[in-house]
Regions:
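ABC ATPase nucleotide-binding domain helical subdomain, centered on the C-loop/LSGGQ "ABC signature"
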Residues: 54-56, 71, 89-132, 176-177, ...
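Helix N-cap at the start of a conserved alpha-helix in ABC-type nucleotide-binding domains
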Residues: 169-171
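ABC-fold ATPase nucleotide-binding domain signature/coupling loops
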Residues: 12, 56, 113-145, 154-156, ...
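Conserved catalytic loops of ABC-family nucleotide-binding domains
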Residues: 181-190, 198
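C-terminal portion of ABC ATPase nucleotide-binding domains
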Residues: 122, 177, 194, 199-240
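Conserved beta-strand
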Residues: 2, 11-22, 27, 53, ...
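Helix-to-loop junction immediately C-terminal to a conserved catalytic motif
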Residues: 44-45
C-alpha cells in the first residue's frame, strides 16, 4: 500500500499502490503522461522512499538491505540515461572488469554488432568526437548502447523506461521481437507510451492519476474496453 508525494508538496503522485512482480514475469507499465510510471520505478530502485507504505524484496523491507547490495539486483535504463566520453566497451561495462564474451553477447542482443565492426577501433572506439578521436552515435545507437549496458550487468531484475523512444519503427520492432530473448530468465518491467510494445509482455498494469486502474493481459484489457483499450485503439489509428 505505497503512496508517494514529492518533498514540499501534499499532492500524491502515487496513491495506495499495491502490486507484486513474479520471478521471470515480463510486465508493462502504461498510462498517460503524469500517471506515475517513472516515479514508481524510482521507488523500486530506492531513488525515492515511499511517503507511506513499504516495498519488499523476497518478503524483506528493501530498506533493510544495504543500498549497494540492493541495487546490484537491478539493471535499469532510464529515459535520461547518459553515455560517457570513454571507449564503447567501458561505457557498457560501467566500471566493472570487461568480459569480452558478455560484451559481445550484449551488443548482439541489441543489434549493434555490425555497427561496432564499422567503428575505427571496434569496441575500443571512444564515444563522442574528442578533437576528432571519437565517434558520435545516433540517438537510436545511443539508446541501444544503454540497453546493452543494462544487459551486460546481468542482474535478475531488468527495468526499461521508454527504451525505444529514439528508434525508428523498424528498429523498434526488432527490439520488441528480441525482448523475450534479452530478458530470458529475468523479471522485467517495461515502460512505454507505445501500446504496441505491450503485446510482448505477460502482464500489463495501467496507472491513472497515481493509482492502478487496470491489470491484465493485452487481450483481456482490450476486451474490457477501458483505459488501455482506448490508448491502444487511439494509437492504432495512426498506423492504419
Amino acid at each position: 500500500d505505497v503512496s508517494f508525494s514529492y518533498p514540499g508538496t501534499n499532492i500524491p503522485v502515487l496513491e495506495h499502490v499495491t502490486l507484486s512482480f513474479a520471478v521471470g514475469e515480463k510486465t508493462a507499465l502504461v498510462g498517460r503522461n503524469g500517471a506515475g510510471k517513472t516515479t514508481l520505478i524510482k521507488l523500486l530502485c530506492r531513488l525515492y522512499e515511499p511517503t507511506s507504505g513499504y516495498i519488499t524484496l523476497n518478503g524483506i523491507d528493501i530498506r533493510k538491505y544495504s543500498y549497494k547490495e540492493y541495487t546490484q539486483a537491478f539493471s535499469v535504463v532510464f529515459q535520461d540515461f547518459h553515455l560517457f566520453s570513454l571507449p564503447l566497451d567501458e561505457n557498457i561495462a560501467a566500471g566493472t572488469e570487461i568480459d569480452e564474451a558478455a560484451l559481445q553477447s550484449s551488443l548482439a542482443k541489441v543489434g549493434l554488432t555490425g555497427r561496432v565492426q564499422q567503428l575505427p577501433q571496434g569496441v575500443r572506439t571512444r564515444l563522442y568526437n574528442n578533437n576528432g578521436s571519437g565517434v558520435d552515435l545516433s540517438g537510436g545507437e545511443a539508446q541501444r548502447t544503454a540497453i546493452a549496458r543494462a544487459l551486460y550487468k546481468d542482474a535478475p531484475f531488468v527495468i526499461l523506461d521508454e527504451p525505444t523512444a529514439a528508434l525508428d519503427p523498424i528498429a523498434e520492432a526488432e527490439i520488441y521481437e528480441q525482448f523475450s530473448q534479452m530478458t530470458a530468465g529475468k523479471t522485467a518491467v517495461y515502460i512505454s507510451h507505445r501500446m504496441s510494445s505491450c503485446k510482448f509482455c505477460d502482464r500489463i498494469i495501467v496507472l491513472d492519476h497515481g493509482r492502478i486502474a487496470e491489470d491484465g493481459t493485452h487481450d483481456t484489457l482490450l476486451a474490457n474496453h477501458g483505459i488501455y483499450a482506448n490508448l491502444y485503439e487511439t494509437q492504432a489509428q495512426y498506423y492504419t
